C-alpha cells in the first residue's frame, strides 16, 4: 500500500510551506499574538488561493478536493503558527457538509469556501 502524497498533494504542501514561511516569520507571529489579532491581509490572500474552500464541492464555490488536502493545509498552518481563522472555518464547513440540510449547505458553504463567512462548531 502506498501512502505517499500525490503530485498535486505535494504541490499543495510545498506551496503552503513556502507561502506561510514567508508570511509568518516568528516576529510577526509574536506581534499578532500579543495584539490578540490575526493577519487579515494574509487571510484574504489565502482566500484568493481558495484554501478555505479546498474541501467544499465545486458546485458550492469550493475546489472539491478532499480531506487529505485539507489536513495538509492544516498541518502547514500549524507548523507556521499562523494565527488565522482557518481551523474553525474548516470544522464548521465539515460539520455542515456532513450533517447540514441542503438549504444550510447552500446558504453557508459558499461563504465558508470564499472566506466571506467565518464559522465555528458549537455544542449545547
Predicted regions and their residues:
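Intrinsic disorder at enzyme termini
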Residues: 1-8
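Glycine-rich flavin
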Residues: 21-124
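Conserved S/T- and glycine-rich ATP-binding loop of Class I adenylate-forming
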Residues: 9, 20
Amino acid at each position: 500500500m502506498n501512502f505517499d502524497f500525490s503530485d498535486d498533494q505535494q504541490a499543495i504542501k510545498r506551496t503552503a510551506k513556502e507561502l506561510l514561511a514567508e508570511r509568518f516569520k516568528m516576529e510577526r507571529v509574536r506581534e499578532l499574538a500579543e495584539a490578540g489579532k490575526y493577519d487579515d491581509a494574509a487571510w484574504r490572500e489565502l482566500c484568493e488561493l481558495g484554501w478555505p474552500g479546498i474541501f467544499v464541492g465545486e458546485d458550492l464555490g469550493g475546489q472539491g478536493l478532499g480531506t487529505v488536502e485539507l489536513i495538509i493545509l492544516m498541518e502547514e498552518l500549524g507548523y507556521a503558527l499562523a494565527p488565522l481563522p482557518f481551523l474553525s472555518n474548516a470544522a464548521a464547513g465539515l460539520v455542515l457538509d456532513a450533517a447540514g440540510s441542503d438549504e444550510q449547505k447552500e446558504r453557508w458553504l459558499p461563504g465558508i469556501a470564499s472566506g466571506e463567512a467565518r464559522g465555528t462548531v458549537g455544542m449545547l
